[in-house]
């Protein structure tokens, strides 16, 4: 949301008074994020990892995170482009395709896993950078959905983008909560969306960017 109207190439909007009077909405996003990690699990996951998860009675995504966290920041030069279903923002190109770049004999499955995490986070940052170039100052980000369940991924987003990230108690049902906020204002429980949101949205976790990692 912004109090000013301006245009960002590849990002939808601004939509004046879309949510609150006197504010405008910008809409940019990725066509694939958590689904790329699911793709990795379904297609590239080593059988030994699956067996290890069974032996340790561990969620497979937690094990993937553990393996990825053992790889250095920057993934030893391996880069993953997140255009697995095209690019929504800032290029708006449905024909763009994802890739791994920088593979070597030393590349391991853990490198590929970390590259997925980093690539998705950098994809989000690409949208933010485009907005900043147009004059929009992003000060904090609230995340919801499946990706927001991962502390590792949320901290990585904060480190790469360079602003605090927050998740909410209702992050897995954010759409339903939004409906409740609208209804609460509609029936007069709250006088406006600002007060309703302040009262009904509860922050769960905060991720402060590590500026050393950001470099």
Regions found by a protein language model. Give the residues of each.
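Glycine/Thr-rich phosphate-binding loops that ligate phosphate moieties of nucleotide
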Residues: 2-215
């Amino acid at each position: 949301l912004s109090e000013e109207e301006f245009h960002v190439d590849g990002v939808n909007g601004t939509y004046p008074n879309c949510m609150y009077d006197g504010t405008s909405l910008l809409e940019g996003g990725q066509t694939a994020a958590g689904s790329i990690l699911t793709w990795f699990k379904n297609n590239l996951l080593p059988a030994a990892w699956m067996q290890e998860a069974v032996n340790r009675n561990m969620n497979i995504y937690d094990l993937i995170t553990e393996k990825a966290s053992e790889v250095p920041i920057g993934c030893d030069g391996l880069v993953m482009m997140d255009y697995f279903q095209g690019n929504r923002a800032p290029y708006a190109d449905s024909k763009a395709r994802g890739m791994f770049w920088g593979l070597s004999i030393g590349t391991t499955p853990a490198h590929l896993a970390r590259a997925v995490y980093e690539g998705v986070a950098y994809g989000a940052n690409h949208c933010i950078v485009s907005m900043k170039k147009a004059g929009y100052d992003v000060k904090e980000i609230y995340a919801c959905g499946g990706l927001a369940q991962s502390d590792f991924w949320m901290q990585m987003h904060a480190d790469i983008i360079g602003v605090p990230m927050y998740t909410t108690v209702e992050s897995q049902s954010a759409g339903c909560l939004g409906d409740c906020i609208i209804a609460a204002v509609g029936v007069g429980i709250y006088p406006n969306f600002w007060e309703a949101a302040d009262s009904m949205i509860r922050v769960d976790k905060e991720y402060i960017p590590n500026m050393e990692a950001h470099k």
